[in-house]
C-alpha cells in the first residue's frame, strides 16, 4: 500500500471519528447498542466474506473489524478482487471501508446487520406505498412518533403534559374531522407538534417558540419530509405567536400548507390551554360539535379557574379559523 493511500485513510478516519464523537455525545450518551444496521454499497459483499454460512446477514463486530483490518493491508485492486467487484478501480471502496470501520469501533455494537438494501430500494418502496401499489404491515407512523418523543425527551419536555396535550389535540382533531377536512397524515403532524411544542424551553424560556421552531427544523425526524417538518415547526411557533398573513410566510409555505398550519395551530392552542397548569386536572374528556359550538365535556375534582380563563382567551383564534366556538362543559366529581 502506498504512503499516499495510508495518509488518505488516516484523514478519513480522523474526520469520521470526530463526527461520531459528537453524535454519541448528543444522541447515545450511556446507551448500549446491540445491533448496528449498515446499508449501502460493498457491505453485503463484506458480510458474505466474513460470515459465509449465515443467512440472516448478521456479523459479529469483532469478526467484522478483523476482516476490515485484513483488507486495510491490501491495495485497491486487491480489495476489489477479494470482494469480486466489477470495477477494480472504484475510488469509493476505501472511504466506505473506513466509515464502516470507524462506526463499528465507535458505536461498540455487539453485532452488525447488513440487510442488503440501499437508498434506491427505499425510494422505490416509498413510491409504491404512496401510490397504493403494495400493502404495508409495519406501522411507520409509530416510528415517527417514537422519533418525536426521543427528541422531546432529549430537550427535557414534561412527559405527563405532553401525553395529556397529545390526547386532547387528537380528540379535538377527530371530533372536527368533517369541519377541517384534513386527513390521517395531518393528524400525525398535529401529534408530532404536540409532542415537540415545548422543546425550545430547554434553550430559552423567553424565546421558547422560536427555539422550538429552530430545533424542529434542524432535526431529521424519521419518516417526515422537509415540507412536513416546516408545517410542524410553524404549528408549534404559532401555537404561541399570532399567525401572520399568508404573504409574510409565502417563502416558507405554499397556500395549502399555510391553511394546514392555521388549522393545526388553532387546535393546538385550545388543547394546550386545557392543561396550562401542567397538572392534568381533567378526566373522561369528551368532545362533540353541536351547531356552531365545539362542546368539550370534562370531569374534574380540581379548581380549573386558570384553565377556563386561558381557554376563553384562545377561543377567538379557533373560532376565526373554523367558525366554531369551543366551550367547556364542566362536571364536578367529588371524591
Describe the predicted segments one by one:
Residues 1-269, 275, 290-292, 296:
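Helical "lid/coupling" subdomains associated with nucleotide-phosphate turnover
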Residues 277-326:
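Low-complexity, glycine/alanine/valine/leucine- and proline-rich hydrophobic stretches
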Residues 43, 119-120, 301-303, 333:
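Short, glycine-/Ser/Thr-/acidic-enriched flexible segments
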Residues 110, 322-335:
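A short amphipathic beta-strand at an alpha->beta junction
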Residues 270-271, 314:
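Amphipathic alpha-helical domain-onset/packing element
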